[in-house]
Amino acid sequence: MFTGDGFWHNGVVSYIGMVIILLQTPIFFNQQYPSLVDIAQRWQLVWDKDAAFELRFDQNCLSLHKRDEPKLDGISVDFVSGAVAHRRKFGGGRGQSIAKAVGLKQGVTPTVVDGTAGLGRDAFVLASLGCKVIMVERHPVVAALLEDGLRRAYEDAEIGEWMRDLMSLFHGSSISALADAAQSSGTEIDVVYLDPMYPHREKSALVKKEMRVFQTLVGADLDADGLLAPAMALATKRVVVKRPDYAEDLDGVKPSMVIATKKNRFDVYVKSAMK
């Protein structure tokens, strides 16, 4: 069982866990704003006047901006309003493909580790359907955005109570976190969900904006194939891998079943029945 800096406590997550990443990340921000200074210190971010990215804190929201593309809107994590809130209310509930992939059904609501959290959208969908979700994110800037999104969601009158119960964040290497958790006798995780970054062919404005920003910020997930083995060791029921429809199988391993959508697919690696 993980305690302290780990993300396990009695088999579930009850707080935001964080480990210190020794490699400091350069970022630009207004040093006159104490809130930004505090965020930088917490996430081991180093002020750099020549950094490619800027963090801003406006209207109680942390956002990331690509400095050489000032016309791009900032990227932030918002679980309270916008597209994710609309999907929570009108997205199809447990009939959604992602819900089927993780094994959600009547009487079964799995505990899920999202090993590649990103902006937390898929994790939020699962949490809104009742799953307890632990998000793992290794990049400190992305983790800072996630933490800020969680903070605002926890404070929200409509969703705050269940968000505090069901969604939490762990900052660290996904491969190491999954491998370490798999060796813990107190760990009980039904499903590990993975969505490694993969080059997109779509040309929509949203994809272009986010992929341009994220690929510049974090780079490609060159070690993505290394996620499958520790994920399989940790999950008691199944591992779900979200892939573009044209992508090869993760680590070259054929899934037990595939749930296809219009643009993506969910490769499901079954270990035991959901019950």
Swiss-Prot record:
Keywords: Cytoplasm, Methyltransferase, rRNA processing, S-adenosyl-L-methionine, Transferase. Coiled coil: none annotated. Its EC number is 2.1.1.242. It comes from the Bacteria. It is an enzyme of class 2 (transferase). Pfam families: SAM_MT (PF04445). It catalyses: guanosine(1516) in 16S rRNA + S-adenosyl-L-methionine = N(2)-methylguanosine(1516) in 16S rRNA + S-adenosyl-L-homocysteine + H(+). Its main location: cytoplasm. S-adenosyl-L-methionine binds at residues 121-122, 137-138, 173-174, 195. The keyword Cytoplasm applies. It is found in: Cytoplasm. One of its GO terms (cellular component) is cytoplasm. One of its GO terms (molecular function) is rRNA (guanine-N2-)-methyltransferase activity. HAMAP family: 16SrRNA_methyltr_J (MF_01523). Belongs to the methyltransferase superfamily. RsmJ family. Specifically methylates the guanosine in position 1516 of 16S rRNA. This is Ribosomal RNA small subunit methyltransferase J.
